[in-house]
């Protein structure tokens, strides 16, 4: 990072690789990015390779992908149980930031309450399960990481959505929280169904 970014080099001054036990990477599946276009097989192959390479936070790092971008966390409404906007076209993905700017409920993540995060985590579990297994429902903690890994989500996105010119909307931030914290956090998240 220091080699490519002067600001990062300054902030990381005095730190060595051994000072970091875990590395998490967040990446937007940005269909309008000309370097890694969602419609270009080479671009999507690169993302698949990245997921294979960055699959462990204690080694090279763990990669999480937002579909289509980090703003997906804003694209929620508490009264919508079965997610009203499941996907966007790859053409719309480039304008997605503007599309969700009108959503008022989850605009400022700094103001999210515990109940908000509980709802967002529940939604993310159900959405990920819907993308991978076609079922909008929660799964056990074990199943979450056995069947709904970042690689599973990516492959299902390619097969079921991108191949049809769409991308299923999913924020990886709640999935990261569920994986980062132990199973007791998962149990607390699911103890009160908000949807």
Please name every model-derived segment.
Residues 1-6:
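Domain-level signal for Mg2+-assisted phosphodiester chemistry and nucleotide/NA-binding surfaces
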Residues 7-195:
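C-terminal accessory helical subdomains adjacent to catalytic cores in phosphodiester-
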């Amino acid at each position: 990072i220091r080699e490519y970014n002067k600001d990062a080099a300054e902030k990381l001054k005095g730190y060595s690789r051994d000072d970091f036990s875990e590395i998490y990477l967040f990446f937007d599946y940005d269909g309008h990015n000309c370097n890694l276009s969602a419609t270009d097989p080479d671009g999507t192959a690169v993302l698949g390779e990245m997921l294979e390479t960055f699959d462990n936070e204690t080694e090279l790092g763990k990669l999480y992908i937002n579909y289509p971008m980090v703003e997906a966390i804003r694209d929620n409404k508490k009264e919508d149980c079965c997610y009203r906007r499941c996907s966007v076209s790859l053409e719309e993905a480039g304008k997605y930031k503007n599309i969700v700017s009108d959503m008022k409920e989850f605009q400022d993540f700094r103001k999210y309450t515990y109940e908000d995060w509980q709802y967002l985590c529940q939604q993310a579990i159900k959405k990920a399960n819907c993308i991978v297994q076609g079922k909008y429902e929660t799964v056990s903690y074990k199943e979450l990481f056995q069947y709904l890994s970042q690689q599973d989500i990516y492959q299902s996105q390619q097969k079921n959505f991108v191949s049809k010119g769409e991308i299923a909307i999913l924020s990886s931030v709640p999935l990261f929280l569920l994986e980062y914290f132990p199973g007791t956090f998962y149990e607390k998240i699911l103890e009160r169904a908000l949807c």
